[in-house]
UniProtKB/Swiss-Prot annotation:
UniProt-listed Enzyme Commission number(s): 2.3.1.-
Name of the featured protein: Tetrahydroanabasine acetyltransferase
Phenotype caused by lack of the gene: Foliar and seeds sweetness associated with the accumulation of quinolizidine alkaloids (QAs) pathway intermediates and their derivatives, but lost production of quinolizidine type antinutritional alkaloids.
Practical use: Disrupting the production of quinolizidine type antinutritional alkaloids (QAs) by selecting inactive tetrahydroanabasine acetyltransferase variants is a potential kick-start for the domestication of novel legume crops.
UniProt xrefs under Gene3D superfamilies: Chloramphenicol acetyltransferase-like domain
Source species: Lupinus angustifolius
A Pfam family annotated for this UniProt entry: Transferase
GO-annotated biological processes: alkaloid biosynthetic process
Domain of life where this protein originates: Eukaryota
Pathway: Alkaloid biosynthesis
PANTHER family, sorted: ACYL TRANSFERASE 4 (PTHR31147), HXXXD-TYPE ACYL-TRANSFERASE FAMILY PROTEIN (PTHR31147:SF25)
Catalytic machinery residues: H163, D388
A GO term, aspect molecular function: acetyltransferase activity
Amino acid sequence: MAYQMASLKLEMNEVVHVKPSKPTPSIVLPLSTLDHRPYPDSIWPIVHVYRSASNGKLDPAFVLKQALSKALVYYYPLAGKLVKQPDGKVAINCNNDGVPFLEAIANCNLSSLNYLDDHDILIAKQLVFDLHLQDENEYPHPVSFKLTKFQCGGFTIGMSTSHIVCDGWGACQFFRAIVELASGKSEPFVKPVWERERLIGSITTQPMPNPMDEATAAVSPFLPATDVMYELFKVDKESIRRLKMSLMKEISGNETMEQGFTSFESLAAYVWRSRARALNLNNEGKTLLVFSVQVRQHMSPPLSDGYYGTAITEGQVVLTMKELNEKPLSDIVKLVKESKNIAFTGDFIKNTIDTLESNPENFNVEEGPGATLALSDWKHLGFMPNVDFGWKEPINMVPAPCNMFEYEGLCIFLSPSKYDPSMEGGVRVFISLPSVAMPKFREEMEALKVTTP
């Protein structure tokens, strides 16, 4: 069931700043080299969707604010402000400024929005806190919240997190701590640690090369575009199984695979090729697939469980459009697997950090319009914690298409919502494309349901 933007109207309360419930240290904390990988103003907003409680007596805004206040005792840097240091780097001033919290009341039921399970997710933009900065030199708050109550008793929690402070794993850890405290726990199960000094690089005279340059990057006739669409595509478990089976048939008899292909590797290659086809990239131009690789447990020694800063490197695969379009898909999947395995190694992690410390511009890929696809896998992050704080677990979670999620070259793999049982074991693919390119991409994704690639 589709919905229209006009079906949602919100009545806003005044913004409040939620502070830690106990005194916290007043200190300026430096960030790591990897923390500086995103732009300082990069905010990634997500919306958690909850059904109404069985008793209906609890006020979700009150419960969440109380739990947030307790969580900030442990995560007190998130109640501070980002500041620029004399050396140009960013730090957190732990000044107890508090977390901006906005409460809103909607004029409809969540069921009328299909619990945000439809492909049209632009409505999610209204459910996150768009805090406009008064000064262009000012940085956003590390985190902010918007809780929207619906007429049915259900609600959404829009959490906007600064990517320079937390990566996806860290943001999930923080959100889980809030939910645990809201459920009555006396403390979070995982205690946060700062330890950003573990990921500070050294100046190197041999930085990693830029994977692609502007002169050789592929271009699309559809970009730049002013009319961009955002969609969520559902890929069920059977479609993924069929895709992986077809890949194994391609390599059968030609070579021995010690390991099969994962769902991520298979779908990453397929989506990369499908997007490139939809954008009609020029044949001789190069296209880059870059995807986040979590390295917490691959450090030596591994990072502490409570580490919530950025701890990701990037797997990278570069092909010409002709190669991407004509190679067997299994060859492309193998390149994804190889790149992922390299990104896990200690040498690659160290070289990434040292290169970022020495030449951060090497990570700002100059590209022709549409040449790069940046892929992030959220399926195993735990954004929908199985913790009941009065409303059971969230039924859905979606990214809101604003700030860094407005980037045309971004794609996110998400777990299915619990609203659609038929999607158990499947994947949702969030992607943005020029409107003129979306029909072709949709056709490619539909092909997964009926035929082998």
